[in-house]
């Protein structure tokens, strides 16, 4: 069982101290190197064990699973291993949705994935076959014809499977325990003022807001309005997946509030302005709802957005141009 690694605590004073001409680049470098060391540690363990054929990477939304997985694949390849990424996001089917009491569709549960196909493809890869995986378009929320080349790892390569449900029984159950390594990735941190400002869930929400605006054609109030569904669904799986993991990777970067808070504040402000002018676009997450309304609870979302504004205005800002091109933050910034 993995244990949550040491929680990172950053104060507003710490963030202000980082902003010096020389201090910020050095602090960014230390934070990024810490994350790289996590990846290298996992890669070393997998590469040194010839029995390992699969790495399962799990974690809640906006934890950096994709970037971590891509880096891990690269690290394994650098150690002479043939390795590929298999993303469970491409196996969304959305054929049978459930809903919460306010009409939010559940896009987070394992039932929204075609786990039968994912398990077949994974088994074929491990056996040495070449596989063309499906493609899911998050803008249209539909599976589209895949144009990706087939992937293969031969008889001794490694598949790195990533997704919220990367450690579910449907994926791990076909393998002996010695054949795979489990990784649970999640930011585990708090940003402090006189009392706590932001916790780990808030940090992920801000990452998700920034990503949804830039990657998925959504505005900030859409993400905030849908967040209760994300939280409730994750609670059903969180402990089980952490228990099955061998490692917890803390994906929080100590300098990230300087960048993410600034962008999220801008995104929230634009959404609230549109709301007040009566120009707010309906939530893309409610398009498949079982009730006919544009948002699950827009009043609650607006109240949360205004609270976030108060918190985020206390955090000093740095431009996203300071973020290295290889940073996990680029998964959310779309740089």
Model feature map: region roles:
Residues 68-72:
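Hydrophobic positions on the alpha1 helix immediately C-terminal to the Walker A/P-loop
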Residues 62:
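Walker A (P-loop) phosphate-binding loop of P-loop NTPases
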Residues 55-57:
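Hydrophobic anchor at the beta1->P-loop junction of P-loop NTPases
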Residues 1-41:
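Charged, amphipathic alpha-helical linker segments immediately N-terminal to NTP-binding catalytic cores
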Residues 74-84:
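Post-Walker A helix-loop "phosphate-sensing" segment adjacent to the P-loop in P-loop NTPases
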Residues 5, 26-29, 174-335:
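Conserved NTP phosphate-binding and transfer environment spanning the P-loop NTPase/kinase superfamily
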């Amino acid at each position: 069982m993995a244990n949550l690694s040491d929680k990172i605590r950053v104060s507003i004073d710490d963030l202000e101290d980082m902003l010096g001409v020389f201090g910020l680049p050095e602090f960014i470098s230390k934070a990024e190197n810490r994350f790289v060391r996590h990846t290298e540690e996992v890669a070393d363990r997998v590469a040194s064990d010839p029995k390992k054929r699969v790495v399962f990477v799990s974690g809640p939304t906006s934890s950096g699973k994709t970037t971590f997985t891509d880096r891990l694949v690269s690290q394994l390849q650098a150690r002479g291993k043939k390795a590929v990424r298999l993303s469970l996001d491409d196996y969304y089917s959305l054929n049978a949705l459930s809903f919460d009491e306010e009409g939010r569709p559940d896009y987070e549960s394992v039932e929204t994935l075609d786990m039968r196909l994912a398990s077949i493809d994974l088994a074929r890869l491990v056996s040495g076959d070449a596989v063309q995986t499906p493609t899911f378009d998050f803008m249209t929320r539909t599976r589209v014809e895949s144009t990706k080349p087939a992937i293969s790892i031969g008889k001794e390569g490694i598949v790195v499977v990533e997704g919220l449900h990367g450690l579910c029984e449907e994926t791990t159950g076909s393998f002996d325990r010695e054949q795979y390594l489990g990784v649970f990735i999640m930011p585990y941190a708090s940003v402090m003022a006189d009392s706590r400002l932001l916790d780990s869930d808030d940090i992920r929400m801000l990452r998700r807001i920034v990503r949804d605006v830039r990657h998925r054609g959504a505005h900030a109030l859409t993400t905030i309005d849908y967040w209760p569904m994300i939280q409730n669904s994750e609670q059903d799986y969180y402990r089980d997946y952490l228990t099955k993991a061998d490692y917890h990777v803390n994906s929080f970067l100590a300098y990230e509030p300087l960048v993410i808070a600034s962008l999220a504040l801008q995104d929230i402000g634009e959404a609230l302005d549109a709301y007040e002018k009566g120009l707010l676009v309906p939530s893309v997450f409610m398009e498949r709802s079982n009730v006919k309304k544009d948002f699950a609870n827009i009043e609650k979302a607006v109240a949360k957005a205004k609270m976030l504004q108060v918190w985020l205005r206390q955090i000093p800002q740095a431009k996203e141009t300071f973020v290295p091109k290889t940073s996990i933050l680029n998964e959310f910034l779309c740089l």
